[in-house]
Amino acid sequence: MNILCFGDSNTYGYRPDGTGRFDEKTRWTYLLQKKFGNRHRIIEEGLCGRTTIFSDAFREGRRGLDQIGITIETHNPIDLLILMLGTNDCKTHFNASSKTIAKGLIQVIEKAKKYSSQPFELLIISPIHLGNGVGDDDFDPEFDLASEQVSRQLAQEYRKVATHYHAGFLDASKIALPSEIDREHLDESGHAALADAIYKTITESGLLEKGMDSSFCHIA
């Protein structure tokens, strides 16, 4: 079965020290594939700076809503869609609330449904929190204190979205913390912990088993 992982820099595997990308064997997507073996195929679609619906004047092509359709079509058929977005939506210049970001996530889901060649199961992951002081000098000036607060409110809103769609849900902030190096991205241990948690969530919730049973309600 095909599992599409659609996210931002923490799906891409951006290194907290700013030196590029973690090697494949460090990233949570690879670790998840290793756990599943050849039973399922993990499709990695992470992009640094990706948002749900917001266009970033400083970085072209980061709006998830513009990309999810063609991504789905590229990899069809999709059996399970894993979405982990929202961190970049917390940037100061977007001035978005957690409720607004959750509405953006819904738009992404609806577009995915439109372009999918078949009904799919859905796992919504609320991202790790932004670390305290992420907007301080020498860190990331695109964030501020309000950004930190919004990131801490995402899980509550995303859980509501998951309930609405009868989807799986995982709060990554309960699993991992951002690296102390940049207060924003997962380190090696964070990737490993997230892979473990996602695997556990998928297997214990029976998401893939639902996908094989036509009697279950899929996202369509």
Q: Where do the language-model regions lie?
A:
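Alpha-helical cap/lid subdomain in secreted, periplasmic
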Residues: 38, 62-220
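Serine-esterase "nucleophile elbow" of acetyl-processing enzymes
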Residues: 1-47, 53-58, 71-75, 81, ...
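N-terminal start-of-chain detector that recognizes signal peptides
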Residues: 14-16, 52-55, 140-142, 156-158
